[in-house]
């Protein structure tokens, strides 16, 4: 099942309540402010802080 991009209008980062961006290649929702990536499983975003992975930038 594909992720419905219309969900981006209503979902928010559970940590900061900010906007999330969809990364189609990695199938994740990205919070640029907190530098966290939330997985999308079978088209459903898993917006649990303990399931997020930190994004490391250099």
Swiss-Prot record:
Pfam family, one: Trm112p
Record's GO cellular component terms: cytosol
Entry superkingdom: Bacteria
Transmembrane residue ranges: none
Entry coiled-coil feature ranges: none
Assigned protein family: Belongs to the UPF0434 family.
Listed HAMAP family: UPF0434 (MF_01187)
Protein's name in the database: UPF0434 protein Sfri_2386
Organism: Shewanella frigidimarina (strain NCIMB 400)
